Amino acid sequence: MNIHSDSPRQCLEEIIKSASAKFNESIDIAVNLGIDSRKSEEQVRGTVVLPKGIGKDIKVAVFTQGKHLLEAEKAGANIVGGEDLVQEIKKGKKLDVDWCITTPDFIAKITPIAKILGAKGLMPNPKFGTMTSNVAEAIKTIKSGQIKFRTDKNGIIHGKLGNIKFSVDDLLKNLKAFLKVIKSNKPISVKGVYFKSVFLNSTMGKAYKMSKVEDII
């Protein structure tokens, strides 16, 4: 059963108050957009840095060579490697990370594992800032709380804003940042209502419908 509320703050307060699972539930968001998901030009995708982070360590792998190897290690990458790492993954090594970064001079060398990375949504992409010569800056940005988003086949964007241990104020800051970036990525061809509905919930909790989206962005 969905509970309706005009106030994002009230939604979040109720979610945190009613959370009853014996683990640290995440706070999830589902944004239903007024797009035609069958049209490629109306797909909405991008990245956003949540100002208060996501409440967990974001794992990053860097594929590169030369001086960038040491740069990536110093910047805190969880996995760093070159062609040897590519071959290990090709042979079945599991890659338990949230993001993959590569440098322009190495992008061609990850071709053998492009399908593996692509299937997990990890393929480096200049649009996401994950194919770059500034490896240290990319790692810093991602680990500060950067997440990816994209519309699914129903025109809905799913994401995480943090967890139930976050303060309501911090969750509101993340919510505002998330919705602002989605708004800035509105396709030119979309007419009429863009934000059809926004739902918030904890992992095991009820969904709360948030209205007056435009008021907070």
Curated annotation (Swiss-Prot):
Molecular function via GO? rRNA binding; structural constituent of ribosome; tRNA binding
Q: What is this protein called?
A: Large ribosomal subunit protein uL1
InterPro entries, A to Z: Ribosom_uL1_bac-type, Ribosomal_uL1, Ribosomal_uL1-like, Ribosomal_uL1/biogenesis, Ribosomal_uL1_3-a/b-sand
Q: Which GO terms describe its cellular component?
A: large ribosomal subunit
Assembly and partners are described as: Part of the 50S ribosomal subunit.
The record's family statement is: Belongs to the universal ribosomal protein uL1 family.
SUPFAM superfamilies, per the entry: Ribosomal protein L1
* Keyword tags: Repressor, Ribonucleoprotein, Ribosomal protein, RNA-binding, rRNA-binding, Translation regulation, tRNA-binding
Q: Name one Pfam family in it.
A: Ribosomal_L1
Described purpose of this protein according to its UniProt entry: Binds directly to 23S rRNA. The L1 stalk is quite mobile in the ribosome, and is involved in E site tRNA release.
Which GO biological-process labels does this protein carry?
Answer: regulation of translation; translation
Q: Which domain of life is it from?
A: Bacteria
